[in-house]
């Protein structure tokens, strides 16, 4: 949830600085937003790797649920490493009027990779392998995010006089 707060703060900052022609501030805002988001997600990853059982016990998990849930949380949380970057970049694309790029990232993650990977992995190794579809999907989303970030930033038009007067 804190990452969505970062998004909500970042979008108007990007829009303002784009309008003002401050390319350097745009890059700095994106860099800081990604850095904070990835740091937050690394904390989440560490939590789910170190104490998944304690988190599940907050919800009165049975022994069966614990044996299944601890493994699942540890595998799924590996995707957190990549998710922070993807969430921020989706919003960057939207901030610059490239909402379709954000949609492509989301469809790539959910429809093109996650669902087919979960299906295939369930046939190969059952439920234990299904959890790996989440990190797989997020890795593809990172690649798509990087591609669309570059495309989005390269399409921005700046008035060079605005940078000189700022």
Regions found by a protein language model. Give the residues of each.
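Small-residue-rich hydrophobic transmembrane alpha-helices
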Residues: 1-46, 50-52, 83-102
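Hydrophobic alpha-helical interface/terminus motif in multipass membrane transporters
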Residues: 14, 55-56, 93, 120-121, ...
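Residue-level recognition of transmembrane alpha-helices
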Residues: 37, 73-76, 80, 106-107, ...
